[in-house]
Amino acid sequence: MPQLLVQAPPWVRGVFDHAWAPMQALTRQVSSLPDALCDYLMACEVGFLAICPGESRYQLGPGRIRDREVQNVAYVSVEDLAHDNERPLHVIGHLIDHHLGCGGDPKGPWLTDGGGATPGWQEAGGRLPGLFALGYGPDEIALSDVRNYFAQSLALYCRERQRLNVADPQIHKWFRSVLWNKGFWRAQERQRRKGSR
């Protein structure tokens, strides 16, 4: 966003020494996600990532960034990037949950709601409410609801895997065997191609 650092608090400008620095910080965080997931999200017709002043949040449905119509935006706070905390990946986790569940359809079920872009995703996502119900979420945010459980756990898997594994070994195993599993991604791509014929 133009003038992002000008709009940011002075302490943020002290962390970032040039206008592209927040984007570089976001790129570092996103680079911890699996390549197959990033490829999948890039292929979706909707879904957008933007750095903003204010709070990090996921906005479902239509929006506008500059003069561009967009849909399903993960707004990442420049302050969260300056703090180098897990909030950017948490918000991106909501975008991932939504798009793996229904490809970003505003009225479709998210992965954590029982949706799934393929039968394999639906089966994998169907396990998430049961894992959440066990009550082993790594922190209060993760324990608040199943969507936050997924998003916060994903952020911690990217940043503090050992902490997540100690707090909730089952969701750690889910991420390792599903989202970070190249074989699982290949199988989903085969299912998707088979379904489009």
Describe the residue ranges of each PLM region:
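Active-site-flanking segments in enzyme catalytic domains
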Residues: 2-17, 22, 38-197
